Curated annotation (Swiss-Prot):
Family, per entry: Belongs to the Nav/unc-53 family.
A single GO cellular-component term on record: cytoplasm
Expression sites by tissue: Expressed in heart and brain. Present in brain (at protein level). In adult brain, found almost exclusively in areas of secondary neurogenesis from the hippocampus and the subventricular zone.
Protein name as it appears in the record: Neuron navigator 1
Biased composition (Basic and acidic residues): 479-489, 506-522, 558-569, 584-594
Role played: May be involved in neuronal migration.
GO molecular function, one term: ATP hydrolysis activity
Biased composition range(s): Low complexity: 304-318, 414-428, 436-456, 807-818, 893-902, 1179-1198, 1260-1281
């Protein structure tokens, strides 16, 4: 890992116990050695993976991964095992430094011994021992080749990990050490432990001896390895981190052989201890001491702390200060921030935030290299995510980006966490600054950071560090890239191409996988060191830890299930490595952010406080939904519960518990290492998995993925899945270290929990998470909510995730202002910033952070301000940490920010869930936020992987959040850090980061464990079984278990990773004294950590409480406003109802009065007609109006609910429509004979006024809406109202005065009146019920239409670059309706009513449909062709889109006919401007709506059109049944007269030959004619009814034989049904002779012969002889005349109409481009006529593949021209010269093309078009080089034209070049010129 390249021979080690351990027996010696060790042990040595595999016993031997070491000339040391350095790949970058871990150095010093250790399981590693270190193939001896780590594909599983440390030393060469100015690490007694911790920690070791670990240092981490069956894939970040440690080790080695020896011994002891602890952890007993040891080492001295020195983090300070610490891992943001960002040519720069980062990042010079890597990554990301928007920025930057790109990156890794872990590492080096970077700070305890920093500093001066960073960082960058390659399976995205100096992200695969995974892609990009640019890769790296588990699961998922399982294991192991890588990446990030971090808050206690929050972040697990299936599975039920902490607990515990203070020095180193491991995880993820997991979390809940153990992941990220596995494997390696830390942290169980959370969050939240981790357990419950709360603000923005992606990045910049975390804006920004600005923040000086804040931050703030977050910022001053947390929560946001375009792609599926989750937490359940955190936690803690599984996805998310939370306080202030809010503000509280760092140290191992135990691992399952993942807090859960994924005794000091550490310790520590000392130190550290954790926990609790309160207050405010709004609306509705009721009552009253009046009038013989009329009308009208009102009130209320948009106006409309219907129905009966008497009494005139009268009387109580509706219904007769205001009393008096003679008449009339009223009532009731039913149906229908419209609009928006300014006339209405369905609905509501009020001829059903008419319906008009499958392989278009038509809901058949005619007319005018086809509206036979068919010439159907649920009109054109060819003309685009001519020729002569140039559509036409003939014959369609002969493939003899048999069959008249109706002869070579052949063979009666249609490309030369038996009629197709001449124009225009042109922004430009194509074709045709032969012409079909879209057209045309047209023209010109000689002056057609290119940016593309050189006179004359050059350029590309011609061109070219070998030199310059 340190300098060596490790190749994973067996990238996919079995995740299961070691099922694949034996698989690689044939692998390298190293692999074999590993294997032997594994065999000896009986289980895979992949410590992490193995552990994950489940139980120590379950660890099968993973096939030893083969670590290939390349022995660079500079490096003298040889691989210990004698492994040939040949396996090592030279590092291509400057960073080919070979870094040795302390243990490695020792190994080098004592190679034989180390070799032994490596080959054999260290004695102390008894449990892991089986793997032994048979093959020290570790990449420890890093050559100058690409700094790829050895990736033991299987060996690593087997215990390759154990040898990690040893291998590293053996491989590492002192000569290498000098490569970078690395600070020397004094070989402290703890240094060996560090080395061991490398092994044990897996994180550090992975980092330091990633290659080594991969190689198969399975011995120490054997148990782990077994669990994490997966081979260790080295993350570039990990590699960088490891390089840092190695460099330290190397320096120490160089310093003093004795000290080195001691260190080596210590390392061995540590490894042994780790192994033992891991084993015990597997057994469920947790050994905290190992974990503690690691942290101790970290704190005690960076030097001894091999991890510290090895990890790039150990030099984070240097990084931070701009020195080149190889540690720029997860925390390497600075490098990106400064160098990268400023350079930021890749996607990084795309975002302003990035630019800010670059400013911000005084980060290490290495940042340039890393920047380059990142750029690479960015490039990958660009394809994947957006421009790698998140680049490896600071944590905050990452966070912002990740949040923005939440799906991909966020999910993939807790950017904050991952970066934070990376930052933590950096923090270790730069304690105070590191603390400033909340995320990375969180990863590393502040104090440990200082310690580490000190050690790092000790090892290197700032300049030294810088140099180191430059070379190391570069190396790291490459290493990261390389690591990704190693992590190929781990992080597909990180795959590095061996040949490339930069890490090439094979990530396209991974990315694709990630993409598939949903987010993986982005993470993958992150994986790249270049990608690692703060924003993207670091996020990946950061995310890796968080997502690691998820990633593992994802990875597993990505692969086949079986493989997935393997991978799960591998994932664990890889995770470790990846974590290392991640750490490296993180380091960069953290470095970038760390300076601010340290500045912001170096206090360890704060960090611990954060640790607690990380558990809270556990809740964030939900967020990680996409990321890890396991997470989702493990996800704690208690989203907030401390459990999430468990996920990361191991790591956290170690740092936390062991030493709050210890964290400062050792812990920091440890944490750094841990962070590194976490980054490794994240790195792996980062490369592939990281992006994958986090993206997964967005798309595929990592939790889910983990749970499935690859079940889910596969879809999400096959490669990422791989990555995850790889990552997991590395995790164990790192885990050893981490485990030790975890063991310590274990002591501080709660702290540990927090840390573990932090670890998980390491990618972005690692610092946060870790910081939160210490308090995680305690704060777990509270912080989750605060985190949630803080996150919530961000989370909501994440809801805007895609949009917010950019915002998030911007915000990330603010995060960099963790220092100003206290600022409200900062708070806000930090959240975003966490991802992005953090790198800036982490710049050595706070100023850079500010810088970030200023530019990125402002941007982020603006974006954020868009969110609720900005305000929240105030609430959470430490939001920077929170932002991190938010990042985890907001991952979707952050990622989206980073990759607005890509995030939506990955994020939409994943991000949404994450966003939802986040939002959920924010809104009501802290769990959601915590879940996200949890996920992070999980990622952070490999061990947690099991837990993750156990925990539900929620828990995973929780953990993530916790992580974030932890980091948050760190950035703002330590005090806040402890509180849950602090958790939210992990980024903010950078000071606390120190504490967090300490927990981080512990966490890191945990993270490693988590990695080692991928969510998919059996170990994970174990966890779930024990519920440790979900229920146990980190403290509760055994560290060993957490770490290794096996159940360890919680009391055990060693985590799962610790087990590895223990084994490594045993191997490292040669003397018990050293071991005892280290144990004591660890214990002291653990105590310090515990106290720090307690402080941090309290602080975190305070902060969390504050955040909770703020969140609750905010939610209360929101709820209050909502309630107020609801109350207001309820009141309005109540008042409306009251008004209506009053009106109804009043009308009832009036009705009764009117009835009395009417009765009086009827009784009174002399009542005035007017009065009678009035009375009668009153009664009738009142009934109608009453009924209408009643129906309105009943319907209206439901309608009101259905159409919330309607306010009072809706009532008016409603009433109006009801009145209208009532009146129209009433009037209908009035005209009936039965109504004649009544009419005498009350004419419609009086009836109308009477209604107004009632209305008039009721004006006081009636609502204005009723009044207006009544008056409107009354219409002009309202003026009569005054006449009806006669007092009722007077009417009654008049009635009484009536003469009695008329009483009989009155009685009869009254009876009639009553009956009529009853009848009217019944009708009105029926109408009302029908009305209601219809209304409900219409409402449903309208809603369905709206949904469909919105879907269509959404699809369009996805496809279209933006809203189009223009659209085709037919579609304008549709598009407007889509754009504003609400507005169009409102308009539609107003129009339909007016007609309904005035229309008295409506039938009852029509009246019912008036409600539906409220909305216009957009109908899609298509021409449907009858499906015919007559000709095999002939695919023809079934539907032709004509356009859209808007019709009201109350349309009738006549209106619909007109609408269809208009659409068809518009279509024809657009498609055929010259009207050559002869089609018109007369061509339409009919159309169908749903199942209702409308034939135009017949009577329209009785059912009205436009029933509900119909939005498609299928138009049928006239065809054979109507004795027309319009349908055929429409389909073939051949003018109607010509089509009729062809058919008449066929029917008359039965034989037809079509001749003309190729590409004129002859074959297509023959197929259509054959179908027409079959249809016309009426015969049953069978397979043989049309027989096709291709004369290219079949000879004339075959045809003759076939025809003779056919003639015999016909003559015998047997089986006529089997005789084909049509015979198609395609590609006749000699059309003239075919006539004789057919006539000779087909001797049967002419009218019985089949139709024969032939095609030929050659002009038919008719001789007089042929004319004698011209049984064939010849049709010549010419490009100069129809149909070929206008076909292209019509075809392209049809394509434009059908392509939904309103998607295209500029229609005019597109039309100009499409109209230019026929001109180009004609120009080329003219050229060939001049310079070629008559049969070598170019047809229109050459251009039919033209895409609709200017940008697509551009690339399509350039490719077509250079690869198809130029070779075709060349061949034609050659033929022309051969046949005719030089016919005309030569003109290069490219000149005309270049001058007329129609698209806007044509000038840039002119030079891309190849020239057509004049053909040489002689075939081989020297005058033809230019032509040959062009042929050479274009021929290799597939020619669109005849493949035969392509072959001939190649043959000719070969002949030319063979004959003139010197031509190459002549052609090269020209070739370059053309290119």
């Amino acid at each position: 890992m340190l300098g060596s390249s490790v190749k994973s021979v067996q990238p996919e080690v079995e995740l299961s116990g070691g099922s694949g351990s034996g698989g690689d027996e044939g692998a390298d010696e190293s692999r074999g050695a590993s294997r032997k060790a594994a065999a000896a042990d009986g289980r895979g040595m992949l410590p992490k993976r193995a552990k994950a595999a489940g139980g120590s016993g379950s660890m099968a031997k993973a096939s030893a991964a083969e670590l290939k070491v390349f022995k660079s000339g500079s490096v003298d040391s040889r691989v210990p095992g004698g492994l040939p350095t040949s396996n090592l790949r030279k590092q291509k970058s400057l960073t080919n430094l070979s870094f040795l871990t302390d243990s490695e150095k020792k190994l080098q010093l004592y190679e034989p011994e180390w070799s032994d250790d490596m080959a054999k399981a260290p004695k102390g590693l008894g449990k892991l021992g089986p793997k032994g270190r048979e093959t020290p193939l570790m990449s420890k001896t890093l050559s100058k080749s690409e700094h790829s780590l050895f990736q033991p594909k299987g060996g690593s599983t087997g215990g390759a990990k154990t040898p990690l440390a040893p291998l590293a030393p053996s491989l590492g060469k002192p000569s290498r050490i000098p490569r970078g100015p690395y600070a020397e690490v004094k070989p402290l007694s703890k240094a060996p432990e560090a080395a061991v911790s490398d092994d044990g920690k897996s994180d550090d070791e992975l980092l330091s001896s990633k290659a080594k670990a991969q190689k198969g240092s399975g011995t120490v981490p054997s148990a782990k390895g077994q669990e994490e069956r997966a081979f260790l894939k080295v993350d570039p970040e990990l590699v960088v981190t490891v390089l840092g440690d190695l460099e330290q080790l190397l320096f120490s080695q160089m310093l003093d052989p004795e000290s080195q020896r001691k260190r080596t011994v210590q390392n061995v002891l540590d490894l042994r201890q780790n192994l033992e602890e891991t084993m015990s952890s597997l057994r469920g007993s947790q050994v905290t001491h190992s974990s503690l040891e690691m942290p101790c080492y970290d704190s005690d001295d960076a030097n001894p702390r091999s991890v510290s020195s090895l990890s790039n983090r150990s030099s984070p300070l240097s990084w931070r200060y701009g020195q080149s610490s190889p540690r720029l891992q997860a925390g390497d943001a600075p490098s990106v921030g400064g160098s990268c960002r400023s350079e930021g040519p890749p996607a990084w720069y795309m975002h302003g935030e990035r630019a800010h980062y670059s400013h911000t990042m005084p980060m290490r010079s290495p940042s340039k290299l890393s920047h380059i890597s990142r750029l690479e990554l960015v490039e990958s990301l660009d394809s994947d995510e957006v421009d790698l928007k998140s680049g490896y920025m600071s944590d905050s930057d990452l966070m912002g980006k990740t949040m923005t790109e939440d799906d991909d990156i966020t999910t993939g890794w807790d950017e904050s966490s991952s970066i934070s872990s990376g930052l933590s590492d950096a923090s270790d080096n730069l304690s105070s600054e590191e603390f400033n970077a909340s995320s990375s700070l969180n990863s590393l305890p502040t104090t440990p950071t200082a310690s580490r920093r000190s050690s790092t500093i000790v090892l290197r001066t700032d300049s030294e560090k810088r140099s180191l960073a430059e070379s190391g960082l570069n190396w790291f960058s490459e290493s990261e890239e390389k690591t990704p390659k190693k992590l190929e399976y781990d992080s597909g995205s990180l795959k590095m191409e061996p040949g490339t100096s930069k890490w090439r992200r094979e990530r396209p695969e991974s990315c694709d996988d990630a993409s598939k995974g949903g987010e993986l892609k982005k993470p993958i990009s992150l994986g790249h060191p270049g990608s690692l640019k703060k924003g993207k890769t670091p996020p990946v790296a950061v995310t890796s830890p968080i997502t690691h588990t998820a990633q593992s699961a994802l990875k597993v998922a990505g692969k086949p299930e079986g493989k997935a399982t393997d991978k799960g294991k591998l994932a664990v192991k890889n995770t470790g490595l990846q974590r290392s890588s991640s750490d490296a990446g993180r380091d960069r990030l953290s470095d970038a952010k760390k300076p601010p971090s340290g500045i912001a808050r170096p206090s360890t206690s704060g960090s611990f406080g954060y640790k607690k929050p990380p558990p809270a972040t556990g809740t964030a697990t939900v967020m990680q939904t996409g990321s890890s299936a396991t997470l989702s599975k493990i996800q704690k039920s208690s989203g907030i519960p401390v459990k999430p902490v468990n996920g990361r607990k191991t790591s956290l515990d170690v740092s936390n518990s062991v030493e709050p203070g210890f964290l400062a020095p050792g812990a920091r180193s440890n944490i750094q290492y841990r962070s590194l491991p976490r980054p490794a995880k994240s790195s792996s993820m980062s490369v592939t998995g990281r992006g994958g997991p986090r993206p997964v979390s967005s798309s595929i809940d990592p939790s889910l993925l983990s749970t499935k153990q690859g079940g889910l992941t596969p879809s999400r990220l096959k490669e990422p899945s791989k990555v995850a596995s790889g990552r997991s494997t590395p995790a164990p390696v790192n885990q050893t270290d981490r485990e030790k830390e975890k063991a310590k942290a274990k002591a501080v169980a709660l702290d540990s929990d927090n840390i573990s959370l932090k670890s998980i969050g390491s990618p972005e939240s690692t610092p946060k998470n870790q910081a939160s981790h210490p308090p995680a357990t305690k704060l777990a419950e509270l912080p989750p909510t605060p985190l949630r709360a803080t996150a919530k603000s961000f989370v909501k923005p994440p809801s805007l995730a895609n949009l917010d992606k950019v915002n998030s990045n911007s915000l990330d910049l603010p995060s960099s202002s963790d220092t100003h975390a206290s600022k409200v804006p900062d708070l806000h920004a930090p959240s975003s910033s966490t991802g992005g600005p953090l790198p800036s923040c982490f710049t050595p000086s706070p100023a850079p952070i500010l810088n970030i804040n200023s530019a990125s931050f402002s941007q982020g703030l603006e974006l954020m301000s868009g969110f609720s977050v900005p305000k929240e910022t105030r609430m959470y001053p430490k939001l920077s940490g929170l932002h991190r947390s938010m990042e985890s929560l907001q991952m979707p946001m952050s990622l989206p920010s980073a990759f607005p375009s890509s995030a939506p792609i990955p994020t939409p599926p994943t991000a949404p869930s994450e966003e939802d989750t986040e939002e959920l937490p924010w809104s009501g359940s802290p769990r959601a936020g915590q879940l996200d955190s949890s996920q992070r936690d999980r990622n952070t803690l490999p061990k947690k992987g099991l837990r993750y599984q156990l925990q539900s996805q929620e828990e995973t998310k929780e953990r993530r959040h916790s992580h974030t939370a932890g980091g948050l306080p760190e950035s703002d202030d330590q005090a806040e850090l402890p509180s849950p809010p602090a958790l939210s503000m992990s980024l903010s509280a950078k000071g606390q980061l120190t504490n967090i760092v300490s927990p981080t140290a512990a966490t890191t191992p945990r993270i490693t464990r988590s990695n080692s135990i991928p969510t998919h691992e059996a170990a994970f399952e174990l966890y779930s079984g024990s519920q440790m993942g979900s229920t146990l807090s980190l403290a509760e859960r055994p560290k060993g278990m957490i770490r290794s994924g096996s159940f360890r005794d919680p009391t055990d000091d060693v985590h799962g990773s610790v087990l590895s550490l223990a084994s490594s310790a045993s191997s490292t520590y040669s003397s018990a004294e050293e071991r005892m000392q280290s144990e004591q130190i660890r214990k002291l550290r653990r105590e310090l950590e515990s106290s720090q954790e307690k402080v941090a926990t309290l602080t975190s609790q305070l902060s969390a409480n504050a955040n909770l309160v703020a969140a609750f207050e905010q939610s209360l405010v929101n709820m209050t406003s909502r309630l107020r709004h609801l109350a207001e609306t309820a009141e309005e509705k109540d008042t409306e109802l009251l008004d209506l009721r009053e009106t109804i009552d009043f009308l009832k009253k009036k009705n009764s009065e009117a009835q009395a009046v009417i009765q009086g009038a009827l009784n009174a013989s002399e009542a005035t007609p007017k009065e009678l009329r009035i009375k009668r009308q009153n009664s009738s009208d009142s009934i109608s109006s009453l009924n209408s009102i009643t129906s309105h009130s009943s319907i209206g209320s439901s309608k009101d609910a259905d159409a919330k948009k309607k306010k009072k106006k809706s009532w008016v409309y409603e009433l109006r429509s009801s009145f209208n219907k009532a009146f129209s129905i009433k009037k209908g009966p009035k005209s009936a004979s039965s109504y004649s008497d009544i009419e005498e009494i009350a004419t419609p005139d009086s009836s109308a006024p009477s209604s107004p009268k009632l209305q008039h009387g009721s004006t006081e109580t009636a609502s204005p809406s009723i009044k207006s509706s009544t008056s409107s219904s009354v219409g002009t007769e309202v003026t009569e109202t005054p006449a009806h205001s006669v007092p009722h009393t007077r009417l009654f008096q008049a009635n009484e005065e009536e003469e009695p003679e008329k009483k009989e008449v009155s009685e009869l009339r009254s009876e009639l009146w009553e009956k009529e009223m009853k009848l009217t009532d019944i009708r009105l009731e029926a109408l009302n019920s029908a009305h209601q039913l219809d209304q409900l149906r219409e409402t449903m229908h309208n809603m369905q239409l709206e949904v469909d419209l919105l879907k269509a609009e959404n699809d369009r928006l996805k496809v279209a670059p933006g809203p189009s300014s223009g659209c085709t006339p037919g579609q304008v209405p549709g598009s407007s309706a889509l754009s504003s369905p609400r507005r169009s609905l409102g308009l539609a509501l107003s129009h339909p009513f007016s007609p309904s009020l005035t229309d008295t001829d409506l039938s009852p059903m029509d009246g019912i449909s008036t409600c539906g008419s409220k909305e216009e319906v957009t109908l899609r008009v298509v021409v449907r062709m009858p499906p015919q499958h007559i000709i095999k392989g002939d695919l023809k278009q079934q539907e032709f889109f004509l356009g859209c038509s808007k019709v009201s809901g109350k349309v009738d058949w006549k209106m619909l006919d007109e609408a269809v005619f208009q659409v068809f007319k518009d279509y024809i005018s657009k498609m055929d401007p010259a009207s050559t086809l002869g089609l018109s509206t007369e061509s339409i036979h009919g159309y169908s709506l749903s199942h209702v068919k409308r034939v135009l010439d017949a009577e329209p159907p009785e059912m009205p059109p436009c029933r509900r649920g119909v939005n498609n009109i299928s138009v049928a054109l006239k065809g054979l049944k109507e004795k027309c060819v319009d349908s055929l003309v429409f389909e073939t685009l051949i003018p109607k007269p010509m089509m009729q001519h062809y058919i008449s020729l066929l029917l008359k002569h039965r034989r037809l030959v079509l001749s003309g140039p190729s590409g004129t559509g002859k074959t297509y036409l023959t197929n259509r004619l054959a179908e027409y003939l079959v249809e016309r014959s009426g015969r049953e369609v069978t397979d043989g009814i049309v027989s096709t002969f291709n004369m290219h493939q079949q000879s004339c003899k075959d045809l003759q034989l076939y025809l003779s048999n056919l003639a015999n069959q016909i003559d015998r008249e047997t089986g006529i049904g089997d005789v084909p109706l049509v015979i198609l002869l395609d590609d006749l070579s000699e059309a003239g002779s075919i006539s004789e052949l057919v006539n000779g063979a087909l001797t049967c009666k002419y009218h019985k012969c089949p139709y024969i249609i032939g095609t030929t490309n050659q002009p038919v030369k008719m001789t007089p002889n042929h004319g004698l038996h011209l049984s064939f009629r010849m049709l010549t197709f010419s490009n100069n005349v129809e149909p070929a001449n206008g076909f292209l124009v019509r075809y392209l225009r049809r394509k434009l109409v059908e392509s939904d042109s309103d998607v295209n922004a500029n229609k005019e430009e597109l039309l100009r481009v499409l109209d230019w194509v026929p001109k180009l074709w004609y120009h080329l045709h003219t050229f060939l006529e001049k310079h070629s032969t008559s049969d070598f012409l170019i047809g229109p079909c050459f251009f039919l593949s033209c895409p609709i879209g200017i940008e697509d057209f551009r690339t399509w045309f350039i490719d077509l021209w250079n690869n198809s047209i130029i070779p075709y023209l060349q061949e034609g010109a050659k033929d022309g010269i051969k046949v005719h000689g030089q016919k005309a002056a030569w003109e290069d057609p490219v000149e005309w093309v270049r001058d007329t290119l129609p698209w806007p940016s044509a000038q840039q593309d002119q030079s891309k078009l190849y020239h057509l050189p004049p053909p040489s006179v002689g075939p081989h004359s020297t005058a033809s080089p230019p032509e040959d050059r062009t042929v050479k350029d274009s021929t290799p590309n597939s020619l669109d034209s005849d493949p035969l011609m392509a072959m001939l061109l190649k043959l000719q070219e070969a002949a030319n070049y063979i004959e003139s070998p010197d031509r190459e030199t002549i052609l090269d310059p020209n070739l370059q010129a053309t290119l």
